[in-house]
C-alpha cells in the first residue's frame, strides 16, 4: 500500500474515532489484545505506554559487547560525522534513537507510532520503547519522551538527521505546539560513514544488510521486514488485535542494539593504527577521512592498503585519489607508475594518459613521451559514445597535441 493511501486510511480511521469519543486525549482506548508487556505512564496530556528493557554492559550483540563503544572518545565520532559539537559531549550523554512510522517517506500525515531510545545509565544499557496504542495518545507519548531527552546532549541514529528527527520535530509542533529543533543537536548519523566504508563491498547499505554482513547480527523469525510495519500497525488500529505488535517491538529493539554495534565498528575502523587490518574499501574511506583532517601520513598508509584491493573498482578509485594526493604533494615522480597502472585497469579512461602527458611535457621535458601519451588518450576516448563531453575532451587533447607539435618543431 502506498504512503498516500495509508495516510488517507489512517486519517479516516482517526476521524471516526474522534467522532466516537469526545475526550480522546484523556480517555484513550484500552490496549489491544496481545500487546507486549509494558507500563502506562501518566503525563499532563494523557497516558503513554512504555516497554522497557535493560541490558548488562557485557551483553554481546553480534561481534561486540555493548560496553565496547564506551572505549572511544567522542572526538573521533566528531571527525567521522563531520560534527565538531559531538566532541563536546560523551557517549553516555548520547541517545540511540529509532522510530517506526505509519509511512516510509515522512510528511504531515506520517506518525511515529513507536519511538525507541537507548541510553547508557548506571552500568547498563537501558532501552525504552514508547508505543502508540491509539492515535489519541500521541501527546502523552511525546510528553513522556521529552522528559527522557532532558538530560541528553545528542543522538546516534541511522538516517535520523534526514528522517526520524525532522518527523519528531513536526509531531511536536502539530501535537504540542512545541518547536523543538532536535535535528540541530549533535548527531552521529551512522548512515553516511557506513556508506563510505562499505558501499563498494556490500550489495546495499540498509541497516539489515550491514548488521548481517559486518556485525554478524542475525535476527530471529520474530522479526518483520520494515516495509510491512506501517501496514501491520494499521491492521492493529482497525482490529484492536495487537498480536503482531511484538514483532515490531522486536524489530525496533534490534535496530537500536545494532546502532550501538555499528557505531562501535565504525569508530573502530577509523581508529586502526594498522591499515592492513582493513578491507580495501574500508582503507579507502579511512584514507579520505585522514586526508580531510590533515593526517597525511595516516592517509598515505591507508591509500597504499586500498590500492592493493582485490576489487577492481576499489583499486581504481584508490589509485585515482592516491595519484591526486601525490600530485598535490608535488611528488609526481612517484605517481608515474600508478598512472600507468590506472591506464591498464581502465583503458577507456583518458585521464591517466593526460596526466602522464602533462608530466612528460612540463616536468620531464620529454616531448616525445608527452605526445605518445596524448595520442594514447585519444585512443581511450575513441571508445566513448558520441556526445558533447567526448567532443569537449577530444578538442582539449587535440589542442595539447598541437602545442606539443609546435614545441617539437621549435626544438
What are these model-derived regions, one by one?
Residues 1-91, 286:
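N-terminal accessory regions of nucleic-acid-interacting proteins
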Residues 196, 202-277:
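Acidic, Mg2+-coordinating catalytic module of metal-dependent nucleases/exonucleases
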Residues 286, 321-322, 356, 370, ...:
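Structural register within alpha-helical repeat arrays
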Residues 311-313, 347, 382:
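Short coil turns that delineate tetratricopeptide repeat
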